[in-house]
Design a protein with these regions (language model features):
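A hydrophobic membrane-anchoring alpha-helix module
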Residues: 119-149
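Sensory/regulatory domains in signal-transduction proteins
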Residues: 106-115, 134
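Thr-Gly-centered strand-to-loop micro-motif
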Residues: 98, 114, 129
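Disordered, low-complexity tails and leader-like regions
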Residues: 63-65, 117, 131
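Short N-terminal secondary-structure initiator segments
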Residues: 1-13, 131, 135-138, 142
Length: 149
């Protein structure tokens, strides 16, 4: 094999390696983009669950769930919420479990503080808006109330 042919082969190998690296980078970027789109869709889906939660709270606060007929109707109306929760679980989406635990500001936003001398500072005492993760990625931060003395 002559030197010129050897050089041509080496250049071709270098070109193929460069193209391979570009394809690999493009593929990784597409995966990241798709994951972000899925996260955005899940975030919108979570808003539907929030709406059910708010409605359920209002019904209970107004005492509209006292009669047996009302309870049955409410149970039927909340069935889509259960379906939605099952779908979220299928995609490894879970509520952040932070109630009664020390605040983790990487996954929570403090929306209010309350004094309580019987508890230590930074303990989450109320969740105003549930936070969610998908796998080990944060989808939505929890909005919480914590102790501050």
């Amino acid at each position: 094999m002559n030197e010129e042919h050897q050089k041509s082969i080496e250049e071709e190998i270098t070109l193929i390696k460069r193209e391979n690296l570009k394809l690999k980078n493009d593929m990784e970027e597409m995966i990241i983009t798709n994951e972000r789109k899925i996260d955005e869709m899940i975030s919108e889906f979570i808003k539907v669950i929030d709406s059910f939660d708010k409605s359920e709270t209002v019904v209970k606060e107004k005492g509209l769930d006292q009669e047996e007929t009302s309870q049955k109707a409410i149970k039927r109306m909340l069935q889509p919420k259960k379906v939605a929760a099952t779908i979220l679980d299928k995609y490894d989406v879970h509520k952040i479990d932070i109630l009664g635990k020390p605040i983790n500001e990487d996954i929570c936003t403090i929306v209010e503080t309350e004094p309580d001398l019987e508890q230590e500072d930074g303990i989450v005492i109320s969740i105003e808006k549930d936070g969610y993760t998908r796998g080990n990625r944060l989808i939505r931060r929890a909005e919480v109330v914590v102790i501050k003395n």
